[in-house]
Amino acid sequence: MKTNPL
């Protein structure tokens, strides 16, 4: 699962 760097 990838985390969104927002």
Curated annotation (Swiss-Prot):
Its main location: virion. It is found in: Virion; Host nucleus. Keywords: Capsid protein, Host nucleus, Virion. It comes from the Viruses. GO terms for cellular component: host cell nucleus; viral capsid. The keyword Hydrolase does not apply. The keyword Transferase does not apply. Structural component of the T=16 icosahedral capsid. The capsid is composed of pentamers and hexamers of VP5, which are linked together by heterotrimers called triplex. These triplex are formed by a single molecule of VP19C and two copies of VP23 which bridge major capsid protein VP5 multimers together. Triplexes occupy the local threeflod positions between capsid hexamers and pentamers. Belongs to the herpesviridae VP19C family. Interacts with VP23, VP5 and UL25. This is Triplex capsid protein VP19C. It comes from Human herpesvirus 1 (strain KOS) (HHV-1).
